[in-house]
Amino acid sequence: MGFGDLKSPAGLKVLNEFLADKSYIEGYVPSQADVAVFDALSGAPPADLFHALRWYNHIKSYEKQKSSLPGVKKPLGNYGPVNIEDTTGSTAKDTKEEDDDDDIDLFGSDDEEENEESKRVREERLAQYEAKKSKKPALIAKSSILLDVKPWDDETDMAKLEECVRSIQMEGLVWGASKLVPVGYGIKKLQIQCVVEDDKVGTDVLEENITAFEDFVQSMDVAAFNKI
């Protein structure tokens, strides 16, 4: 598995094709899989690779929360198309904390002569290490929610209904993948994923805002609710 060399145009093209029908590298919410691939990139993909660029900008919005995203960060060879090998040449570390800690050599090389200069360097590194540890963000409680949004009848414009739902923007709310699911008599419901920060967005708030589009929405139900 892999994307080839993610620092090359060919590797970015593979990533773009992989994300053509996906919101995330794995599953329906941002995870350490997204962090592993994001960290392997040299920068934002070019504008013509719009699937990869959309994903890149979305994951970039989690910059301060990367270490708290669910899952375990694995080597790049664990992600991507099964018929392509990873050749990026960098191994993903288990966590953002390890990334930060590995940047700092606390004690220097074994053969470094113990003198005033080496003591000063070591003290500076210890100070940097402590500063980075103190700046790590507090864990934010989040939940992944799958919503069922039902229209009035089979004549309801479902594209407009989804547009209305996604127009709801608030701090602590991120919309994810969606699909239309048949319920009978030609009627389809909108099934849409979202991730919320528990202390900022509740299901009651979502229901109030979604059912406010009463010309399109008959009702809203929570199909699945999982803590992240």
From Swiss-Prot:
Keywords per UniProt: Elongation factor, Phosphoprotein, Protein biosynthesis
Posttranslational mods: Phosphorylation affects the GDP/GTP exchange rate.
Top-level taxon of the source organism: Eukaryota
Listed GO CC annotations: eukaryotic translation elongation factor 1 complex
Biased composition (Acidic residues): 97-116
Description of how the protein assembles with itself and partners: EF-1 is composed of 4 subunits: alpha, beta (alpha subunit of the eEF1B subcomplex), delta (beta subunit of the eEF1B subcomplex), and gamma (gamma subunit of the eEF1B subcomplex). Interacts with elongation factor EEF1A1.
Function: Catalytic subunit of the guanine nucleotide exchange factor (GEF) (eEF1B subcomplex) of the eukaryotic elongation factor 1 complex (eEF1). Stimulates the exchange of GDP for GTP on elongation factor 1A (eEF1A), probably by displacing GDP from the nucleotide binding pocket in eEF1A.
Pfam families: EF-1_beta_acid, EF1_GNE
Record family assignment: Belongs to the EF-1-beta/EF-1-delta family.
Signal peptide range: none
One MF term in the entry's GO annotations: translation elongation factor activity
PTM sites of type Phosphoserine: 109
Protein name: Elongation factor 1-beta
Cited InterPro entries: eEF-1beta-like_sf, EF-1_beta_acid_region_euk, EF1B_bsu/dsu, EF1B_bsu/dsu_GNE, Glutathione-S-Trfase_C_sf, Transl_elong_EF1B/ribsomal_bS6, Transl_elong_EF1B_B/D_CS
Provenance organism: Xenopus tropicalis
